Amino acid sequence: MQILQVKKQLVLTSRLKDLGHLPLKALSSETGEIFVAMDPVGTKDGDWVFTIANSAARDAAGDKRLLTDLTVGGIIDDWQPKQK
């Protein structure tokens, strides 16, 4: 699991059927690395979240058939990132 911040929802003109219909969000780490995750919990831009990766990400998304390796597992109520 990893703690990341939601940057924005990705808008897709079309997508593979096996990606399902969950929103996709662009997330970033405290170091600026960008990730894309499925969002079954309804995050907003700026939220800090924890993510579930690898094969467990499909379970967390609610369907083992979905093509994902990263899913938002929950919104963190109070997270203070490290000061740079």
From Swiss-Prot:
NCBIfam families reported in the protein's UniProt record: carboxysome_B
Protein location: Carboxysome
Domain BMV: 1-77
Main location: other
Family: Belongs to the CcmL/EutN family. CsoS4 subfamily.
Annotated keywords: Bacterial microcompartment, Carbon dioxide fixation, Carboxysome
Domain notes: The tight homopentamer forms a pore with an opening of about 3.5 Angstroms in diameter which is positively charged.
Purpose: Probably forms vertices in the carboxysome, a polyhedral inclusion where RuBisCO (ribulose bisphosphate carboxylase, cbbL-cbbS) is sequestered. Has been modeled to induce curvature upon insertion into an otherwise flat hexagonal layer of major carboxysome subunits.
Pfam entry (one): EutN_CcmL
Gene Ontology cellular-component terms listed: carboxysome
Domain of life from the UniProt record: Bacteria
Subunit (UniProt): Homopentamer.
Gene Ontology biological-process annotations: carbon fixation
Entry protein name: Carboxysome shell vertex protein CsoS4B
Source species of the chain: Hydrogenovibrio crunogenus (strain DSM 25203 / XCL-2)
Name of encoding gene: csoS4B
